[in-house]
């Protein structure tokens, strides 16, 4: 009988094989995209204020553009990507979000379905559409992408800045416990599950080249406020000439 780990490996390999024949190209040349962007990506662990930092940073970047005599162009996106993906796929947004949050459920019928062609075709289509939406946003530039594998997808664009928000497990657990109104043990379990799901989702977009990526800046959300993170990220964006 196949183990869960082996089934997961087979499932992932089948989806990646389908993506190859559907024409997805995940390997890019940095030289080809040297004039594209600028783009900032924010990857984060559970409880960390990714949306807040993105909003503050977009506002600060736009104020800089206005002060320099240019119209404001910066925006930030997160769940909008899932909405656009669901529209393009003609699927219920909840189905797309379910794919993002957990590519497996542990339910027996899902386990059986994971070996059917339609299951893998659907997942490959969702993965490709999300990839293409994020890639297009990154190429167009002046965008801050929160989560969704943005760092792995936009890794090769020279005019980019990749941020990672992290914190100790105890801090994240207490934060989620308060935000969700659940017990500390429940929050701890949720944090561990979500962080694992996010890591798997990011890894699903990695290539043999993007495996070499390191985040430009990592921030400890326990000891830094959203405003402080925004200020340091803004300085990094200036140093990298994104503004």
Each predicted region: which residue ranges?
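Conserved phosphate-donor/acceptor-positioning beta-strand/loop module used by diverse small-molecule
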Residues: 156-192
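NTP-dependent small-molecule kinase module
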Residues: 4, 54, 132, 206-243
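Glycine-rich phosphate-binding P-loop
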Residues: 42-57
């Amino acid at each position: 009988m196949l183990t869960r780990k082996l089934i997961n490996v087979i499932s992932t390999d089948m989806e990646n094989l389908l993506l190859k024949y559907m024409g997805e190209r995940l390997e890019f040349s940095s030289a080809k995209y040297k004039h594209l962007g600028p783009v900032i990506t924010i990857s984060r662990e559970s409880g960390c204020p990714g949306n807040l930092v993105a909003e503050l940073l977009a506002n600060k970047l736009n104020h800089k553009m206005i002060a320099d005599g240019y119209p404001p162009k910066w925006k930030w996106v997160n769940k909008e990507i899932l909405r656009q993906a669901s529209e393009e796929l003609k699927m219920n947004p909840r189905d797309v979000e379910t794919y993002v949050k957990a590519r497996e459920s542990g339910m027996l019928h899902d386990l059986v379905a994971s070996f059917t062609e339609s299951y893998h075709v659907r997942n490959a289509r969702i993965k490709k559409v999300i990839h293409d939406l994020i890639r297009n946003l990154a190429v167009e530039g002046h965008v801050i992408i929160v989560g969704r594998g943005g760092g792995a997808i936009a890794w090769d664009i020279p005019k980019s800045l990749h941020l990672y928000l992290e914190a100790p497990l105890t801090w994240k657990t207490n934060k989620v416990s308060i935000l969700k109104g659940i017990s500390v043990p429940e929050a701890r379990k949720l944090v561990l599950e979500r962080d694992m799901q996010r890591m798997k989702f990011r890894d699903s977009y990695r290539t043999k080249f993007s495996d070499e990526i390191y985040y430009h800046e990592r921030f400890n959300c326990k000891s830094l406020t959203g405003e402080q993170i925004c200020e340091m990220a803004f300085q990094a964006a200036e140093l990298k000439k994104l503004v």
